[in-house]
A protein has these predicted regions:
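N-terminal secretory signal peptides
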Residues: 1-18, 41
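N-terminal export leaders
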Residues: 15-31
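C-terminal segment of N-terminal export signals and the immediately downstream linker at the start
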Residues: 34-72
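Near-N-terminal "mature-domain entry" segment
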Residues: 57-124
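Divalent metal-coordination and catalytic microenvironments
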Residues: 62, 89, 136, 192, ...
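Short, contiguous alpha-helical
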Residues: 82, 90, 129-151, 221-241
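All-alpha RGS (Regulator of G-protein Signaling) helical domain and cognate RGS-like helical scaffolds
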Residues: 87, 98-107, 113, 120-194, ...
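An amphipathic alpha-helical core segment
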Residues: 179-239, 247-253
Length: 263
């Protein structure tokens, strides 16, 4: 597996505009019990992106989990959740803030804008922003794309129809999505995306890249579901059995969040 030490993740804390308190799957909290939202996103394929667009020069901060650290057991154990969030995710936030220090225009961007404009970042900080900005966006969404078993709902009729059209059935989608995650060599992510014409597609990315990074990751669409397949996401519980982690992960997928992003 990919050596995570190459990504320089410190073990101490952040601070940032909160990611405005909830990676958007937040602004609709008043309208949905899951706290998921769809906010319009300029210059992207569809108005699906869930992240807020508010401007500020405050530092990014580590978002709170929408559930207890042990709430996803036995699929994801509490120790893994704690280390994953307070060490790995926290490190991405810390390193992103360091990279953006002295760049007030970039500090005024939301994290979705940073990802969308990743290919135009200054050369001196581009790699650091790509690794750590991607890591912050990806993890903030990952926490929202999960929910305690039995509380995440099921794919909506509209999403089910789109999955069936693209992959044959919802169950066949799960098989192909898991295959994308298993097939990702080293570290990375598996994604379900919505394209401009309303169809859905599966892709995977290396390291902390995501489909919002136009010019770096192209041809997939706007992400509506993502699964972390870095070893730190599962190794304590599943060791090297990534397929077992991906098979169990469906028990804690927050379909209510995915449905809201697809609608």
């Amino acid at each position: 597996m990919h050596d995570e030490s190459q990504h320089s993740e410190p073990h101490d804390g952040p601070s940032r505009r909160d990611f405005l308190s909830s990676v958007a799957l937040g602004a609709l909290a008043a309208a949905t019990a899951t706290g998921v939202t769809r906010s319009a996103l300029a210059n992207t394929l569809t108005p699906l992106h869930p992240l807020p667009q508010e401007k500020t020069t405050m530092a990014f901060t580590l978002p709170e989990l929408p559930y207890a650290e042990n709430a996803l057991e036995p699929t994801i154990d509490a120790l893994t959740m704690n280390i994953h969030r307070t060490k790995h995710h926290n490190a991405y936030v810390t390193n992103l803030n360091k990279a953006l220090d002295g760049h007030p225009t970039l500090q005024a961007m939301s994290i979705d804008e940073i990802c969308l404009n990743m290919n135009t970042m200054p050369d001196g900080i581009k790699t650091a922003v790509r690794n750590n900005g991607g890591g912050h966006w990806n993890h903030s969404m990952y926490w929202k794309w999960m929910a305690p078993k039995g509380s995440g709902g099921t794919p909506s009729p509209a999403l089910s129809a789109a999955l069936a059209k693209a992959f044959g059935s919802v169950e066949e989608f799960k098989v192909k999505f898991a295959a994308a995650g298993v097939g990702r060599f080293g570290s990375g992510w598996a994604w379900l995306c919505k394209t401009a014409d309303g169809t859905v597609a599966i892709c995977s990315t290396a390291n902390q890249d995501n489909p919002l990074m136009k010019g770096i990751v192209d041809g997939c669409g706007t992400p509506i579901l993502g699964c972390d397949v870095w070893e730190h996401a599962y190794y304590l519980h599943y060791q090297n059995r990534r397929p077992d982690y991906l098979a169990a992960w469906w028990d804690v997928v927050n379909w209510n969040a995915v449905n809201a992003l697809y609608a």
